[in-house]
């Protein structure tokens, strides 16, 4: 359910990738706005470039693409909205849909800086992100 689109030859260790339920209450308490709209995806990727794009596959999304926001946990344990220029929601073939359908597989591509705001890992050349969609 996760891969590195810029480095398809590099496999993500699925033992270091998790999908968990994030309750609406916890989402709001931690700083999310609106409704939680998917799984909390926590992913660790080793031996990365200074800036790495991570792609997360997901289904069950419906509504207008522009209504969705991506939130990421920071080291302070709070959710922060990820800037639109750092992520996109697309189909598997790279198209940006206007409307989402629950039975279609989508990909969230998020760019993370090693050691940046949304990198939860203190290890150099390793990123750990925890992201969730809201709408």
Predicted regions and their residues:
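Ser/Thr-rich low-complexity repeats and stalk/linker segments
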Residues: 34-38, 45-47, 66, 78-80, ...
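C-terminal beta-strand-rich structural cap/linker in extracellular carbohydrate-active enzymes
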Residues: 95-135
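Generic structural hydrophobic/aromatic packing signal, biased to beta-strands
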Residues: 2, 43, 54-56, 108-110, ...
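Generic "edge-of-domain/loop-turn" microfeature
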Residues: 9, 19, 48-50, 63, ...
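Generic beta-strand hydrophobic packing signal
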Residues: 43, 68-70, 85-87, 92, ...
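Predominantly extracellular/luminal regions of secreted and cell-surface proteins
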Residues: 1-20
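Extracellular/luminal ectodomains and secreted, surface-exposed scaffolds of diverse proteins
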Residues: 80-101
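Proteolytic processing hotspots in large secreted/extracellular or virion-associated proteins
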Residues: 24-75
């Amino acid at each position: 359910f996760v891969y590195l689109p810029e480095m398809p030859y590099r496999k993500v260790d699925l033992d270091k990738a998790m999908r968990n339920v994030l309750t609406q209450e916890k989402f709001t308490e931690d700083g999310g706005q609106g409704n939680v709209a998917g799984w909390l995806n926590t992913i660790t990727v080793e031996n990365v470039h200074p800036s790495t794009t991570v792609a997360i596959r997901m289904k069950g999304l419906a509504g207008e693409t522009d209504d969705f926001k991506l939130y990421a946990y920071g080291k302070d344990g709070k959710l922060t909205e990820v800037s639109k220029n750092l992520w996109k929601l697309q189909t598997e073939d790279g198209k940006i849909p206007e409307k989402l359908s629950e039975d279609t597989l989508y990909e969230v591509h998020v760019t993370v800086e090693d050691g940046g705001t949304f990198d939860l890992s203190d290890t150099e050349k390793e990123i750990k992100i925890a992201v969730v969609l809201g709408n």
